């Protein structure tokens, strides 16, 4: 009996340690960490920029080949999910999180939903906090010069974007059902401190 009690206690301690380890590594509660501030993660790069880890963030500040934006595209596809992201943008940044892309070899707002980070977009209604050509923002919130958060939920046709605690998008749209996600670098300075996704 005593031996069984010791065994049971050992199993409980082991389970608790495993749970703590899972949470610490960002995999707890179903969340998968794609960027954690210490390593770039496993991406396919489409277009070239000087992506690098610096001071606890994934940073890009220059296109290194051609003129087109650069994208880090996830290896996995996602249908219904939540995303949590922490990022810093300068005033000139043109970036975004592209979701449910129809393919991974070419990324743009026509084949993905583009959750925008672009304070100086000529048409600000689809600037920072909007989904380009799907859901406008008015007034457009600003991301430049500070750390920001995105919480993005895609469940069926229902898309919700929360920027720095403020809901900027709550829309129904069914053009794109599933696919990889991508982080964009277009211009300015972009830093990604954390990106996590939780399949629903």
What are these regions (language model features)?
Residues 1-11, 17-18:
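Bacterial N-terminal signal peptides that target proteins for export
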Residues 22-200:
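Carbohydrate-interacting regions of secretory-pathway proteins
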